[in-house]
From Swiss-Prot:
Keyword Amino-acid biosynthesis: yes
Keyword Secreted listed: no
Intrachain disulfide bonds: none
Compartments where located: Cytoplasm
Organism: Sus scrofa
Principal location: cytoplasm
GO cellular component: cytosol
Domain of life of the organism encoding this protein: Eukaryota
Comment field (misc): In eukaryotes there are cytoplasmic, mitochondrial and chloroplastic isozymes.
Record protein name field: Aspartate aminotransferase, cytoplasmic
CDD domains linked to this entry: AAT_like
Family indicated by similarity: Belongs to the class-I pyridoxal-phosphate-dependent aminotransferase family.
Keywords from the named record: Amino-acid biosynthesis, Aminotransferase, Cytoplasm, Pyridoxal phosphate, Transferase
Length: 413
């Protein structure tokens, strides 16, 4: 008699919520269906958009006979790493000029977070110190918890961020949690377009946050997934990162080029490291190299080449910023239109938070029962938290979505 499968006792894992939602949407035959859960840009025809500048650069790469498919270095394409870190920190960054910045090419923003988390678990605040508290915002992108837990951190905590009553930033709660955190704790900060709330601190509020973090010796780990994509302005979206660097912080910044280049399936990311002196960067990168070697060993070239060529060529860079602004402006327009329709319908509650928020997502304030109603009765797919992707809205479905939200709010308490 053959023994049972060695995999017989493996439990079935729960599906990843957002991808389950997308699968349910695809299987829904209702012609009215609307996908507000997808985490990617869509045109007004609800189609993916390949940026024109990306098409142009792809063609140039394809026709460049000097290129080949040799392995990239373990830390990635040098030109890409330099350009990516410069984009985050600014051309005039003292840290760059003083050569105390390093970059690690990664598999998207998630890869940058993971490599950074693995390094911190081994080398931050004492060798192999996985007891260091890691703070993530409440709420946050669900992968933050998983990445740091999987890297071995044992103490993942939440810091207050979202005020449900006023549908905005809970600054006092945030500052209080910073004050009460153990010294040298790690704080995961959203650089701009906070996911899922779409609510960012103002520059003045960032200054207050930085002041407490500096006094308490707290380590900032920025997640920058939407630079340029949030406001349409690269400098504005990187303001917090650059301010922290100007204040003398050592920090990590996980960068993603999925959204602002539309390179979702190329997995283009970078981990920018800022230290106090050049020698530290050399040692940190030497350890990062060891971690990458046993994780993915060498990163892919195509996406990194596209980004590096675009960022290093003034003409292509100008075209790219125009493409990014096109996406950002459409999202801002959909925010204004949705708010206007809900207010015209006299939907109970206040809806100014929709236009106060920024970036791809809006935290609507809808409760789980109202979300369930929208999915089951109206075939409008969104996360149980009430988060919607503004890119899923179009001039063709805005009226239907607004009317459906109005019904959900008035019928379901």
């Amino acid at each position: 008699m053959a023994p049972p499968s060695v995999f017989a006792e493996v439990p079935q894992a729960q599906p990843v919520l957002v991808f389950k939602l997308i699968a349910d949407f695809r299987e829904d035959p209702d012609p009215r269906k609307v996908n507000l859960g997808v985490g990617a840009y869509r045109t007004d025809d609800c189609q993916p958009w390949v940026l024109p500048v990306v098409r142009k650069v792809e063609q140039r790469i394809a026709n460049d006979s000097s290129l080949n498919h040799e392995y990239l270095p373990i830390l990635g394409l040098a030109e890409f790493r330099t350009c990516a870190s410069r984009l985050a920190l600014g051309d005039d960054s003292p840290a760059l000029q003083e050569k105390r910045v390093g970059g690690v090419q990664s598999l998207g923003g998630t890869g940058a977070l993971r490599i950074g988390a693995e390094f911190l678990a081994r080398w931050y605040n004492g060798t192999n110190n996985k007891d260091t508290p890691v703070y993530v915002s409440s709420p946050t992108w669900e992968n933050h918890n998983g990445v740091f837990t999987t890297a071995g951190f044992k103490d993942i905590r939440s810091y207050r961020y979202w005020d449900t009553e006023k549908r905005g930033l809970d600054l006092q709660g945030f500052l209080s949690d910073l004050e009460n955190a153990p010294e040298f704790s790690i704080f995961v900060l959203h650089a701009c377009a906070h996911n899922p709330t779409g609510t960012d601190p103002t520059p003045e509020q960032w200054k207050q946050i930085a002041s407490v973090m500096k006094r308490r010796f707290l380590f900032p780990f920025f997640d920058s997934a939407y630079q340029g994509f949030a406001s349409g302005n690269l400098e504005k979206d990187a303001w917090a990162i650059r301010y922290f660097v100007s204040e003398g912080f050592e920090l990590f910044c996980a960068q993603s080029f999925s959204k602002n280049f539309g390179l979702y399936n190329e997995r283009v990311g970078n981990l920018t490291v800022v230290a106090k002196e050049p020698d530290s960067i050399l040692r940190v990168l030497s350890q990062m190299e060891k971690i990458v070697r046993v994780t993915w060993s060498n990163p892919p070239a195509q996406g990194a080449r596209i980004v590096a060529r675009t960022l290093s060529d003034p003409e292509l860079f100008h075209e790219w910023t125009g493409n990014v602004k096109t996406m950002a402006d459409r999202i801002l327009s959909m925010r204004s239109e949705l708010r206007a329709r809900l207010e015209a319908l006299k939907t109970p509650g206040t809806w100014n938070h929709i236009t106060d928020q920024i970036g791809m997502f809006s935290f609507t304030g809808l409760n789980p029962k109202q979300v369930e109603y929208l999915i089951n009765e109206k075939h409008i797919y969104l996360l149980p938290s009430g988060r919607i992707n503004m890119c899923g809205l179009t001039t063709k479905n805005l009226d239907y979505v607004a009317t459906s939200i109005h019904e959900a709010v008035t019928k379901i308490q």
